[in-house]
Amino acid sequence: MKVLAAMSGGVDSAVAAARLVEAGHDVTGVHLALSRNPRSHREGSRGCCSLEDSFDARRAADRLGIPFYVWDFSDRFVAEVIDPFIAEYRAGRTPNPCLRCNERIKFAALLERGLDLGYDAVATGHYARTKVVDGVTKLYRSVDPGKDQSYVLAVLNQDQLSHSLFPLGNSLKMNVRQEAAALGLSVADKPDSNDICFIPDGDTPGWLSEKIGSADGEIRDESGALVGHHNGYHHFTIGQRRGLRLGVPAPDGKPRYVLDIEPVNNTVVVGGAEGLTVHHIEAIRPVWCSSEPVETWHGQAQVRAHGDPVPAIISAVPGGVAVELEDSLRGVAPGQAAVFYDGDLVVGSATICGTDRAGVKAEQAA
């Protein structure tokens, strides 16, 4: 098989490429240049967009003896990932850019170019598994629960999944590092990428302030009483406690959290922890990556990349998905992805637009 190995400059993508070479595939390494100014990203970053990362990817490819190229997708990355990220925060929502990057860049722009050039598949170092069942490529969790990345891949459709390879899905991270060391790969001990790759130093509020600006606004409690001020609602997300400048203490003396963000009024609403409890989720733009389920079914819902799945009743409704949680969740924010599982099988995903806490309607978030 002729395979494009997406090489970020990290240990996982390097070992994934090595395994494909060992399996006898015709492998070409590709590093995606996603920043218009890669020197603006700090050296030693834990992202994947710095010059240092591209050099690490090239060294790994040289060690494996495979061709290597750097492909510039920076313009498309801005249009498909960065601009929507800014727009979501401006609208008071909390997006996950990694899902968008997988959907629109790694398994769209890269895959499209690869197929045009005669490649059969794109491979990455994600910790997830696929299996073809009755002609359908199904997505599953990794065997390493601590590193499972199926959540950020749940936006992929059947066409994308059928041309995707995840060589690390049956491996533990500790074994991958050992394998990298045995192969003589210089990235064997390189730290994992945890930051948003296009935000220097991980300062998301500061970065957003440069893009959106900072407008002073009010912080009010659920009764509407003024309790503080803020210098930009994009500094906050649902469930946040830190950074609240409150001049009026809560009557019960307990901590207060962000319960809602009202961008139209430039207002942040705060309240007690009990106000974060969610039992019902509304979501839009569903993607059924492992075949469309029945109209209503029992499964599990996960709302954060490293969150715990919660038993739920999941129903297809006009315009999206309704989720009744059997166990409540806290701090669920519009803009997050809800990913639906049946055990280890990833059934699909959708974008959260409202909860019984926030009360946001689907048409407002569309």
UniProtKB/Swiss-Prot annotation:
Compartment list: Cytoplasm
Domain of life per record: Bacteria
Active site (record annotation): 101 (nucleophile), 197 (cysteine persulfide intermediate)
Documented EC number(s): 2.8.1.13
Reaction(s) this enzyme catalyzes, per UniProt: S-sulfanyl-L-cysteinyl-[protein] + uridine(34) in tRNA + AH2 + ATP = 2-thiouridine(34) in tRNA + L-cysteinyl-[protein] + A + AMP + diphosphate + H(+)
Binding site for ATP: 6-13, 32, 125
InterPro entries assigned to the protein according to its UniProt record, in alphabetical order: MnmA-like, MnmA-like_C, MnmA-like_central, MnmA-like_central_sf, Rossmann-like_a/b/a_fold
Gene3D superfamilies xrefs: Adenine nucleotide alpha hydrolases-like domains, HUPs, Translation factors
Main location: cytoplasm
Broad enzyme group: transferase
Site (Interaction with tRNA): 126, 336
Record's keyword annotation contains Coiled coil: no
Family, per entry: Belongs to the MnmA/TRMU family.
Known function: Catalyzes the 2-thiolation of uridine at the wobble position (U34) of tRNA, leading to the formation of s(2)U34.
Record protein name field: tRNA-specific 2-thiouridylase MnmA
Organism per entry: Cutibacterium acnes (strain DSM 16379 / KPA171202) (Propionibacterium acnes)
Recorded name of the encoding gene: mnmA
